[in-house]
Amino acid sequence: MANTVKISSCELINADCLEFIRTLPENSVDLIVTDPPYFKVKPEGWDNQWKGDDDYLQWLDQCLAQFWRVLKPAGSLYLFCGHRLASDTELMMRERFNVLNHIIWAKPSGRWNGCNKESLRAYFPATERILFAEHYQGSYQLKSDGYAA
């Protein structure tokens, strides 16, 4: 069941992504901003519903396929992703989208602030990644950097 809020000409929909997006027509969305579960980051059940990384990435790839289907040719995608699977996520995105940039959000009051940093065995992430992409328009052409080889 979807919860819908209308603000002026915008409609915000809170629903299961894969269920709802399948109801949308092709090339009908200008912008997708999504913050899917990161898998094994939070203790809640919704973030741990997959059997392993491969299972999670298969689910995310299904989402990406639907994003590509509904996104207009000049549309944009902003996908928030956790640090652990950011590389895998980007590689999957590049199969369908032209990844334009990585946005690194430095979180001033992230959960790392209250942790015992001395007891950690790795650096605790103080940032969040956002992958910015556009609809794939054909075979990828490496852009010239303007320098002669």
Residue spans of the language-model regions?
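Core catalytic lobe of class I
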Residues: 2-149
